[in-house]
């Protein structure tokens, strides 16, 4: 009987020690399951995901939020991928509604919304807007506000107040492909020698909020503008409104230049477009529409 009890006690102690041992193994296994993935590998994995998934995964951890929303090289890779890949199924429709009351508004509708709904993905007061390399700059002069909108992430960035102009007539948006920088340029209604324009570099904490840039003399600005290969082109008139001419603004050097153009284009207002990576001007004439294309931009600068 004693031997049997000893055997039972031995079996009990053995089984309990085995349970403790197995529990320790499970616990150790659970700890070993937390694999520490290197940061570079995490970034490469996230680069493979679609934009919609990235929006959801920002809440996974602080590290993922920082990578997706703040890491410049990661954001640039996503933008480059979206520009080189075929258009997505989720197409964004952009509308600029010009009304007197409650004022001009800017809308973005997503094609994935049901057709019978009036819910929009974005609505903001905007007198005009410019699109450059995946970002949209919306500006309003009543009140004076400038917002940068990313249609992929649906995030806003409000540009600080200029503290110079109470009434902004024109706002241009450009991208410098060399330094990989977006810049906002605001100008008063009448561009005078004593009234410099101001430039703001988006996302650069080192630069001053706004910098004064001297221009090329007195001229009256037209709102139409386009940014091509790091240069903003726009049309203007002299102070009497009798002559039209083209002006270029180099986003990197922040310098203005006159652009040489045929006289027929300086006699009438034109619509500026990006025509296969070159500056194109659309002009209405008696015969219909004419499209002029600038072949060599460097030779056309004064």
Curated annotation (Swiss-Prot):
Stored Gene3D superfamilies: 1.20.1280.50
Start and end residues of each F-box domain: 31-78
Feature: compositional bias, Basic and acidic residues: 1-10
Name of protein: Putative F-box protein At1g32420
NCBIfam families xref list: F_box_assoc_1 (TIGR01640)
Domain of life: Eukaryota
Disulfide bonding pattern of the chain: none
Pfam families: F-box, FBA_3
Alphabetical list of PROSITE patterns matching this protein: FBOX (PS50181)
Region (Disordered): 1-27
């Amino acid at each position: 009987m004693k031997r049997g009890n000893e055997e039972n006690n031995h079996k009990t102690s053995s089984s309990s020690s085995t349970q403790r041992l197995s529990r320790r193994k499970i616990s150790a296994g659970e700890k070993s399951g937390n694999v520490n993935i290197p940061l570079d590998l995490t970034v490469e994995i996230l680069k493979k995901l679609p934009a919609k998934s990235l929006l959801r995964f920002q809440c996974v951890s602080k590290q993922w939020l920082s990578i997706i929303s703040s890491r410049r090289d990661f954001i640039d890779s996503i933008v480059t991928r979206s520009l080189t890949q075929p258009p997505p199924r989720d197409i964004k429709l952009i509308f600029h509604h010009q009304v007197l009351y409650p004022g001009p508004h800017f809308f973005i509708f997503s094609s994935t919304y049901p057709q019978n709904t009036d819910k929009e993905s974005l609505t903001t007061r905007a007198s005009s807007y410019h699109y450059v390399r995946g970002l949209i700059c919306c500006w309003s002069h009543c009140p004076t506000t400038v917002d940068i909108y990313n249609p992929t992430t649906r995030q806003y960035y409000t540009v600080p107040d200029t503290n110079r102009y109470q009434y902004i007539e024109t706002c241009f948006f450009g991208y410098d492909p060399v330094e990989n920088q977006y810049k906002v340029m605001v100008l008063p209604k009448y561009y005078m020698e004593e009234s410099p324009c101001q430039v703001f570099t988006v996302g650069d904490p080192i630069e001053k909020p706004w910098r004064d840039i001297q221009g090329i003399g007195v001229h009256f600005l037209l709102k139409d503008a386009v940014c091509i290969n790091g240069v903003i082109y726009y049309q203007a008139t002299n102070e009497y409104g009798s002559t039209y001419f083209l002006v270029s603004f180099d986003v990197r050097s922040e310098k203005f230049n006159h652009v040489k153009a045929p006289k027929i284009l300086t006699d009438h207002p034109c619509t500026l477009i990006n025509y296969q990576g070159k500056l194109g001007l659309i002009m209405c004439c008696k015969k219909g529409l004419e499209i002029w294309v600038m072949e060599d931009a460097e030779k056309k600068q004064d």
